[in-house]
């Protein structure tokens, strides 16, 4: 059995790198779409060639946000998912889910480079330290009776909101962009010196045609 899937991610301060799949006839290629400060829709990573392969030498759009600090704990983070298709790399209807992964990262400065920790993740438990302001009217708990919801979620057994998966209720057609999922993120934990907060948005996709084979 062959499952055609794709994964992509985006974070507050880094560019997205899509993981693409090269199976003709049922390709999956998804990307994170975000609103910038001018409320323009930006595909977080445009660095793919005509064949859909990621190419670091190509120009990339990296959406940079206001940095969370002791004095500013909330920042805008408006995200959606796009089914990226092209004539040379046609995709199929894709079912997607998203998870938020908050982390603290050591700054890329001289001191951290000297200590050989620049860019590394700070080992810190993020449970109870992050709040997400979800898009108005389109996100609902799976068991609710909300009929207008485009995204649904079910809390995990751990009770940690960072373990949630958000599922788009309809498959994205080639070229289609989902409704916005997230508006803002707030971090209420500690910020050690020479570190910064990042929210990594992980998106996974599977070809709609493969769903009947999942048990």
Residue ranges and their predicted role:
Residues 1-215:
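Long, small/polar-residue-biased beta-strand-and-loop interaction regions
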């Amino acid at each position: 059995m062959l499952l055609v899937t794709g994964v992509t991610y985006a974070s507050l301060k880094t560019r997205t790198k899509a993981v693409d799949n090269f199976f003709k006839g049922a390709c999956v290629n998804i990307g994170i779409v975000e609103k910038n400060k001018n409320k323009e829709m930006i595909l977080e990573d445009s660095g793919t060639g005509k064949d859909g392969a990621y190419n670091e030498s190509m120009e990339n759009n990296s959406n940079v946000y206001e940095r969370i600090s002791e004095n500013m704990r909330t920042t805008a983070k408006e995200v959606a998912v796009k089914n990226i298709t092209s004539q040379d790399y046609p995709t199929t209807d894709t079912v997607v889910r998203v998870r938020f992964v908050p982390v603290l990262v050591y700054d890329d400065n001289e001191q951290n480079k000297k200590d050989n920790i620049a860019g590394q993740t700070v080992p810190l438990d993020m449970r109870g330290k992050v709040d997400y302001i979800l898009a108005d009217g389109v996100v609902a708990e799976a068991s609710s009776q909300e009929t207008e919801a485009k995204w649904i979620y079910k809390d995990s057994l751990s009770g940690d909101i960072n373990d949630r998966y958000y599922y788009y209720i309809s498959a994205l057609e080639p070229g289609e962009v989902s409704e916005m999922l997230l508006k803002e993120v707030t971090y209420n934990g500690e910020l050690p010196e020479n570190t910064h907060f990042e929210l990594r948005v992980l998106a996974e996709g599977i070809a709609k045609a493969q769903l009947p084979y999942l048990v």
